[in-house]
Swiss-Prot record:
SMART domains: EFP (SM01185), Elong-fact-P_C (SM00841)
GO CC terms in record: cytoplasm
Gene of this entry: efp
Organism: Fusobacterium nucleatum subsp. nucleatum (strain ATCC 25586 / DSM 15643 / BCRC 10681 / CIP 101130 / JCM 8532 / KCTC 2640 / LMG 13131 / VPI 4355)
Keyword terms of this UniProt record: Cytoplasm, Elongation factor, Protein biosynthesis
Protein origin, superkingdom: Bacteria
Protein name: Elongation factor P
Length: 187
């Protein structure tokens, strides 16, 4: 058991019979009222994202999820197939179970498959991935006041905001938790 104010992004809890992962936790204390914590959570069974508010001292059931190393193999319709590199067992997950992970999947990509009560419910990507910029508009010279960003499409088809100096064909590092550009990388 944990109290609500101890939970952070990435914590897993059980509400009713469903497991949830905390996407965002915001502590709020106003003058007269009791402290509260506002959560943005994802139901690991249904994939639904919901908002909830709890008193800071409410007790929550924290749960441990099992993780298994895997490699993304291929897509079959709406199913995505991963394989355990030790046993070569195939693990199948639906597209809606993968969420933002779909933006970064490439064949042979290592990741973790998350299990809840012996059922695969999600995947956990590496914190950072390196991807090639396949399309972006050229940056305009002189348009550099402040932190100016532009859209760039990476080799998986996902668009990410990058600084003006990033050009087509370059490789960039992206934070998979926030979907944000981190830096250019040499390949």
């Amino acid at each position: 058991m944990k109290i609500a104010q101890e939970l952070r992004a990435g914590s897993t809890i059980k509400i009713g019979n469903d497991p949830f992962v905390v996407l965002k936790a915001e502590y709020n204390k106003s003058g007269r009222n009791a402290a509260v914590v506002k959560f943005k959570m994802k139901n690991l069974i249904s994939g639904n994202i919901s908002d909830a508010v709890y008193k800071a001292d409410d007790k929550m059931d924290d749960i441990k999820l099992d993780k298994v190393k895997a490699i993304y193999s291929y897509q079959n319709g709406d199913s995505y197939i991963f394989s355990n590199p030790e046993t070569w067992e195939e693990i199948e997950l639906k597209g809606e179970d993968l969420g933002d992970a779909l933006n970064y999947l490439e064949e042979e990509m290592p990741l973790d498959v998350v299990y809840y009560e012996s059922t695969a419910v999600a995947v956990e990507l590496p914190t950072f991935v390196e991807r090639e910029v396949t399309y972006t508009e050229p940056g305009l010279r002189g348009d550099t006041s402040g932190k100016v960003m532009k859209p760039a499409r990476i080799n998986t088809g996902f668009e990410v905001q990058v600084p003006l100096f990033v050009e087509q064909g370059e490789w960039i590092k992206i934070d998979t938790r926030t979907n944000e550009y981190v830096e250019r990388v040499k390949k």
